[in-house]
């Protein structure tokens, strides 16, 4: 079954009926042009994708990019600080864009100033640094910086600047602000002009809650005060999230500072924002540093500096990103042409979010328990109180929260793009999830940091799931998401008993599967497998082994004998290495071990034209590229259907290679390019420009996790281009258990059966063992295989790559989904290994048929 073509859950409610039942006059779409036509013409790249992270970044239409590119090709734009003709064109165009921005927000240059910044965060920092704070002193209490706890991290971060100025920072809870009306703090001393700043979002980026724009005037006038402090209140209205889908009228709501981010509105350019400053406030702003273009006059040898009279020029240090500013013109043009304006966008996106909220909140398990818990301060009754955001967590039928990272992984199988975590808004996250300050600190001590996938600690969620709509979102997007939730989560795992694999079942693998036979191209040449090959610069290997080994029973015979013998024994049944990261496996029966793991395992990787590592997540056809290692000839042969084989030397001439830097799982690695010939070969097969690079033999990448036993403190463990650890081990009894689950699912409409060989290949392990019980490997603390000793680092947390059939490159979400359900929503399978210690003074090998001796955690030999 192809990914995304999953069995359909209950059909979402009829959209038209919802529109008719709504108390709001809802509109879907933009007049005569259908949404499907808009998507086809302007967002064709979204075909097959459900993009629901518009609060993170919306998408740009094709016409906007085309017109911007055409503009750049037809005009010459120079530095606006110069005085030539091209510079004059740039200056005038930039000023026209400033005016366009003010018009968009229903105001004029007489009331507001547009200061371009590197984004809304830079705009907030500018306010924090330029605001006329008054420090605390014995004579007065000083200024107050108050911010709603439901604010973006970048707003909360302003308190560090305030603290440096000896200014008191006070977080204000939303409920306290709602009840603050009538606290006339200013009336007690009307002559006090002590400046205070209150910051709040027009729309919560966490839940989509929209706070009253009327607060702007109420706080400024003193009718609603965040705290009881005499003085003059200024208001910063964080509009970055709000203005992406709604009109903002600054003639009616005259906040003092309004930071915005343009990619939230147009999709591009990124890295450009603005601070809109009320002209009445501008003279109060202070500036320390001055950069190019901001000075009317200054002396290099004397402390003499006169700022420019224009407030915008005074605060725009250096040359602004003028081409990005010019791109805004085409953003405004496209938005107006495609939608008719922000009022239409607000109606369209609210219709979608209200419909989705209604359908999502009504989903129930058979026992009546809700499928989701929605975090909101509104009933989604009106766009005045709710934006196009839904924040939630998925529950099981017992009411327990399913971790957001698991939901994210499942969504990716259906090509649904959403956001998880706390969304840079910890205040709202704590409030809605019931997380105390002590809990957050405890979670950090347990290893959880912002942006990771640690979703449940001590049974409590560390974050949630967020979907958000943009102006190009469609009804089909909403319904695809609802079907995904229904399909995946209305089949409760408690309704699906998990059978346990028996010892006899595990021993029957040889008759049910051909997984013990090395595939074509495996290391079968005795001169290779038995170690008869030249030395390499990775490890010192002797040229031959004892000839007596050739007269002994073969590894395959050993494996078969043990499988049919002692049911409690553990043996190695298969060994795989993956010379090229994310490409096909190379199966061997005996293979040398080096300091990084199996020799040449994941020593190469394919990168795109930007030098970014490619994986099967982005390019499933990588699994069809088959590498073969020939240690005698010191070459790697790469094959693929329809392509002539190509050879790559195992080691390049160090004097001829140029070292470049790449990244693997956030680690910096030194690599070198394997040449244009193999680049052309890979590019032709994959249909995109790419290169093959190899880890430099002179660079050591150290593992973040180190063995706890067997090595002195400070010892580092070397890694190749692997993600986590040197080895991955999988137990065939565990695979058999999963196969049974999948076969049981066949009775409920699954369209595909899974062989043991297929399942083994999906998990891309190095070592396959035969064990007595499913998942017993997760109880191991360390193991010995022959003379080699390993520490078990923990389970492998699986991603959507296990959905890819390694023989065809086709996706199927059943494996991931079944594994998630059968293991209590966990997606762990296999365990990571690392050498406890390794003596390379003599050759070391892993062999099929070797006995595995596990030691249980806090116990003894298994």
Swiss-Prot record:
Q: Quick one: which pathway? A: Cofactor biosynthesis; molybdopterin biosynthesis
Can you supply a Gene Ontology BP term from the record? Answer: molybdopterin cofactor metabolic process
Q: Which GO terms describe its molecular function?
A: lyase activity; molybdenum cofactor sulfurtransferase activity; molybdenum ion binding; pyridoxal phosphate binding
What reaction is this protein's catalytic activity?
Answer: Mo-molybdopterin + L-cysteine + AH2 = thio-Mo-molybdopterin + L-alanine + A + H2O
Q: Which UniProt keywords apply?
A: Molybdenum cofactor biosynthesis, Phosphoprotein, Pyridoxal phosphate, Transferase
Q: Which cofactors does this protein require?
A: pyridoxal 5'-phosphate
Which of the residues bear the PTM Phosphoserine? 34, 517
Q: Does the keyword DNA repair apply?
A: no
> Which residues does the record list as N6-(pyridoxal phosphate)lysine (modified residue)?
264
Which residues are in coiled coils? none
Q: Which residues form the MOSC domain?
A: 704-855
Q: What is its EC number?
A: 2.8.1.9
Q: Which SUPFAM superfamilies match?
A: MOSC N-terminal domain-like (SSF141673), PK beta-barrel domain-like (SSF50800), PLP-dependent transferases (SSF53383)
What is annotated as the active site? 424
Matching entries from InterPro entries are given as: Aminotrans_V_dom (IPR000192), MoCF_Sase_C (IPR005302), MoCo_sulfurase (IPR028886), MOCOS_middle (IPR005303), PyrdxlP-dep_Trfase (IPR015424), PyrdxlP-dep_Trfase_major (IPR015421), Pyrv_Knase-like_insert_dom_sf (IPR011037)
PANTHER family linked = MITOCHONDRIAL AMIDOXIME REDUCING COMPONENT 1 (PTHR14237:SF19), MOLYBDOPTERIN COFACTOR SULFURASE MOSC (PTHR14237)
Q: Which family does it belong to?
A: Belongs to the class-V pyridoxal-phosphate-dependent aminotransferase family. MOCOS subfamily.
Entry function: Sulfurates the molybdenum cofactor. Sulfation of molybdenum is essential for xanthine dehydrogenase (XDH) and aldehyde oxidase (ADO) enzymes in which molybdenum cofactor is liganded by 1 oxygen and 1 sulfur atom in active form.
- This chain belongs to which protein, by name? Molybdenum cofactor sulfurase
Q: Which organism is it from?
A: Mus musculus
């Amino acid at each position: 079954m192809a990914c995304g073509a999953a069995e359909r859950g209950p059909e979402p409610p009829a959209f038209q009926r919802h529109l008719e039942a709504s108390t709001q006059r809802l509109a879907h779409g933009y007049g005569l042009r259908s949404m499907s036509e808009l998507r086809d013409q302007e967002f064709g790249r979204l075909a097959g994708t459900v993009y629901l992270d518009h609060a993170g970044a919306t998408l740009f239409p094709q016409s906007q990019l085309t017109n911007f590119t055409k503009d750049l090709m037809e005009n010459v734009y120079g530095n606006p600080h110069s005085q030539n003709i091209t510079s004059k064109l740039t200056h005038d165009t930039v000023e026209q864009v400033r005016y366009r921005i003010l018009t968009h927000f229903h105001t004029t240059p007489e009331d507001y100033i547009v200061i371009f910044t590197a984004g809304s965060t830079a705009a907030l920092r500018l306010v924090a640094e330029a605001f006329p704070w008054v420090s605390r002193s014995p004579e007065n209490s000083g200024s107050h910086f108050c911010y709603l706890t439901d604010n973006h991290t970048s707003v909360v971060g302003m308190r560090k600047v305030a603290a440096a100025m000896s200014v008191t920072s006070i977080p204000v809870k939303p409920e306290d602000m709602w009840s603050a009306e009538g606290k006339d703090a200013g009336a007690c001393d009307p002559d006090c002009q002590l400046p205070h700043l209150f910051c709040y979002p027009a729309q919560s980026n966490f839940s989509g809650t929209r706070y009253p724009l009327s607060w702007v005037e109420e706080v400024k006038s003193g009718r609603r005060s965040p705290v009881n402090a005499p003085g003059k209140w200024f208001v910063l209205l964080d509009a970055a999230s709000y203005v992406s889908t709604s009109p903002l009228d600054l003639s009616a709501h005259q906040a003092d500072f309004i930071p915005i981010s343009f990619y939230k509105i147009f999709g591009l350019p990124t890295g450009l924002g603005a601070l809109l400053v009320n002209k009445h406030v501008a003279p109060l702003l202070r500036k320390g540093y001055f950069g190019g273009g901001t000075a009317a006059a200054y002396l290099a040898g004397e402390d003499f500096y006169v700022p420019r009279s224009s407030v915008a020029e005074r605060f725009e240090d250096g040359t602004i990103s003028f081409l990005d500013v010019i791109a805004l013109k085409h953003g405004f043009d496209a938005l107006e042409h495609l939608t008719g304006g922000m009022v239409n966008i607000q109606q369209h996106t609210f219709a979608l979010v209200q419909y989705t909220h209604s359908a999502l909140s009504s989903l129930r398990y058979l026992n009546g328990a809700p499928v989701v818990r929605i975090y909101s301060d509104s009933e989604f009754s009106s766009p005045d109180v709710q934006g196009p955001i839904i924040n939630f967590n998925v529950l099981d039928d017992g009411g327990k929260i399913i971790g957001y990272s698991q939901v994210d992984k499942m969504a990716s199988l259906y090509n649904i793009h959403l956001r998880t975590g706390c969304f840079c808004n910890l205040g709202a996250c704590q409030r809605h999830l019931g997380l105390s300050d002590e809990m957050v600190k405890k979670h950090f001590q347990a290893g959880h940091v912002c942006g990771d996938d640690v979703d449940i600690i001590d049974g409590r969620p560390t974050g949630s799931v967020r979907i958000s709509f943009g102006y190009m979102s469609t009804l089909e997007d909403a319904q695809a998401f609802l079907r995904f939730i229904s399909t995946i989560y209305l089949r409760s795992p408690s309704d699906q008993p998990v059978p346990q694999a028996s010892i006899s079942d595990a021993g029957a693998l040889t008759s049910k599967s051909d997984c013990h036979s090395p595939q074509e191209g495996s290391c079968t040449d005795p001169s290779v497998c038995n170690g008869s090959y030249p030395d390499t610069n990775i490890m010192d290997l002797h040229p031959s082994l004892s000839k007596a080994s050739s007269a002994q029973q073969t590894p395959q015979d050993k494996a078969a004998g043990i499988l049919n013998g002692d049911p409690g024994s553990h043996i190695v049944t298969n060994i795989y290495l993956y010379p090229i990261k994310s490409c096909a496996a190379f199966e061997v029966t005996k293979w040398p071990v080096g300091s990084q793991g199996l020799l040449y395992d994941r020593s190469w990787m394919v990168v795109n034209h930007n030098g970014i590592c490619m994986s099967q997540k982005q390019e499933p056809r990588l699994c069809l590229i088959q590498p073969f290692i020939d240690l005698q000839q010191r070459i790697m042969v790469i094959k693929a259907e329809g392509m002539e084989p190509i050879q790559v030397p195992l080691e390049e001439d160090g004097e001829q290679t140029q070292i470049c830097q790449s990244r693997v799982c956030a680690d910096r690695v030194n690599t070198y390019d394997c040449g244009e010939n193999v680049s052309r070969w890979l590019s032709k097969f994959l249909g995109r420009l790419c290169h093959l690079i190899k880890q430099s033999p002179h660079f050591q990448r150290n593992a973040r996790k180190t063995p706890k036993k067997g090595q002195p403190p400070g010892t580092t463990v070397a890694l190749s281009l692997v993600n986590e650890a040197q080895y991955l081990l999988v137990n065939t009894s565990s695979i058999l258990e999963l196969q049974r689950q999948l076969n049981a699912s066949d009775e409920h409409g699954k369209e595909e059966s899974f062989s043991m060989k297929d399942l083994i290949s999906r998990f891309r392990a190095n070592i396959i063992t035969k064990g007595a019980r499913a998942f017993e490997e997760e109880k191991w603390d360390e193991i010995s295989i022959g003379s080699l000793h390993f520490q078990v680092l923990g389970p492998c947390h699986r991603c959507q790559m296990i959905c890819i059939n390694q023989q065809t490159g086709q996706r199927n979400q059943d494996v991931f989904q079944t594994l998630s359900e059968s293991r209590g929503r966990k997606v762990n399978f296999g365990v990571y290994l690392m050498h406890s210690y390794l003596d390379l003074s003599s050759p070391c090998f892993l062999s099929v048929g070797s006995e595995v001796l596990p030691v249980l955690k806090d116990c003894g030999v298994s």
